[in-house]
Design a protein with these regions (language model features):
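A short helix-to-beta-strand connector/capping loop
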Residues: 44-47, 130, 215-217, 268
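Oxidoreductase cofactor-interface core, primarily capturing Rossmann-like NAD(P)-dependent enzymes
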Residues: 2-38, 55-58, 65, 76-87, ...
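Residue-level recognition of oxygen-bearing side chains
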Residues: 59, 69, 276
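Rossmann-fold cofactor-recognition segment
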Residues: 43-55
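A hydrophobic C-terminal alpha-helical subdomain
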Residues: 225-284
Length: 284
């Protein structure tokens, strides 16, 4: 039996693999990667590597084995039919008879277009008959704290979210939840709504940035069309920019406030405070 992690060299995947290695022997972990060279550090620690690509279904033939636990980390290629990509993995997992397939989805409360592929993937997974766990991940601190250059250049946080609040958490928090599911028992056919312990507004985020930098950083709430133009001017492709503006609209409606406590319970600790993520982002 192996614990198999797809997208293992991505931001979340790397954290999952590293945290798995704190709990299970390396030979029980398989990292699915597109580029073996990017996973050399995993191989050096004894992790098994499997080279496969969501866009090449044949590369998943025989990759899984009966009894495996699989983490399907959602793809980030918004223009390549993510549902089809995910279905490739689900079909291969079903053919192998895996013991569990956990999928990193989106909050059940999210109505933004970002959620569409996740909802469709969930339906494919449920229809497969596989034992499943839906890890409905909320928003990541790092979406904001790893992109501070424009904020610091203009002394302003800009969002089309009004006074809306969100309960984000760090990638490491979501990774810890996934590891708990992959290494624990009793998670079959469960859905977890995952978010940070504390909700915050963009005005509060700007205030925290001001506190840590000693500068006056404002929050500018703008219409969605204005935010779309800003993102496109920054070189973000329109499809992704539109998705991000849609998320802002969902934040304005409170759709990214997740108050279940599922994330901290699975992680076995409180979630990472926003202030800590801001400090890390400022250090670069």
């Amino acid at each position: 039996m192996s614990i198999v992690v797809t997208g293992a060299t991505g931001h979340l995947g790397r954290l999952v693999v590293h945290q798995l290695l704190e709990k299970v022997p390396a030979e029980q972990v398989t990292a699915v990667v597109r580029d073996e060279a990017k996973a050399a550090d995993f191989a050096a620690r004894g992790v098994k590597l499997a080279v496969a690509d969501y866009n090449r279904p044949e590369t998943f033939d025989g990759l899984f084995a009966a009894g495996d636990k699989v983490l399907l980390i959602s793809g980030n290629e918004f223009d390549k039919g993510r549902v089809g990509q995910h279905t490739v993995v689900i079909d291969a997992a079903k053919a192998a008879g895996v013991a569990l397939l956990a999928y990193t989805s989106a909050p059940g409360s999210l109505t933004a277009a970002l959620a569409d592929d996740h909802r469709a993937t969930e339906q494919v997974l449920l229809a497969s008959g596989l034992p499943y766990t839906l890890l409905r991940n909320g928003w990541y601190h790092e979406v904001y704290t790893e992109n501070l250059a424009p904020v610091l250049a203009h002394d302003a946080v800009v969002a089309a979210a009004g006074a809306g609040r969100l309960s984000s958490a760090s990638r490491a928090d979501y990774a810890a939840a996934a590891v708990a599911v992959l290494t624990g028992e009793g998670h079959e056919n469960q859905t977890y709504e995952l978010g940070g312990d504390e909700a915050w507004s963009f005005a509060e985020y700007a205030a925290e940035l001001s506190r840590q930098t000693g500068r006056e950083i404002a929050y500018n709430s703008v219409p969605g069309e204005t935010k779309l133009g800003i993102l496109k001017d920054a070189g973000i492709p329109e499809p992704l920019a539109s998705i991000l503006v849609g998320v802002d609209a969902s934040i304005a409606e409170g759709e990214l406030v997740i108050s279940t406590g599922d994330l901290s319970r699975l992680a076995g600790r409180p979630t990472t405070p926003l202030a800590e993520a801001v400090a890390a982002g400022l250090k670069g």
